[in-house]
Curated annotation (Swiss-Prot):
Superkingdom of source: Bacteria
One Gene Ontology cellular component: ribosome
Pfam families reported in the protein's UniProt record: Ribosomal_L35p
GO biological process terms, semicolon-separated: translation
Coiled coil: none
Family: Belongs to the bacterial ribosomal protein bL35 family.
Protein source organism: Brachyspira hyodysenteriae (strain ATCC 49526 / WA1)
Keyword Ribonucleoprotein assigned: yes
The protein, known as: Large ribosomal subunit protein bL35
Signal sequence interval, chain numbering: none
Keywords, comma-separated and alphabetical: Ribonucleoprotein, Ribosomal protein
Entry GO MF terms: structural constituent of ribosome
């Protein structure tokens, strides 16, 4: 009987897949201490980031049932 592969729970909480198969995740350092940050920096933190090609190589191991 073949065993199921398990998704890493930390990756499940942090990453989402776009419809085209790219991996999206949130910016770091964007959850508090906004008084000392510029408005354009705060705006940048609201937007999701896309993982680069180097990090995409790890995704099948972390999330085997992702797209």
């Amino acid at each position: 009987m073949k065993q199921k592969l398990k998704t890493k729970s930390g990756a499940k909480k942090r990453f989402r897949f776009s419809k085209t198969g790219k991996v999206k995740f949130a910016h770091a350092f964007g959850s508090h201490k906004f008084l000392s940050k510029r408005p354009d920096t705060k705006r940048k933190y609201r937007k999701a980031r896309i993982a680069d090609d180097t990090n995409m190589l790890e995704m099948p191991r972390l999330m085997p049932y992702g797209r």
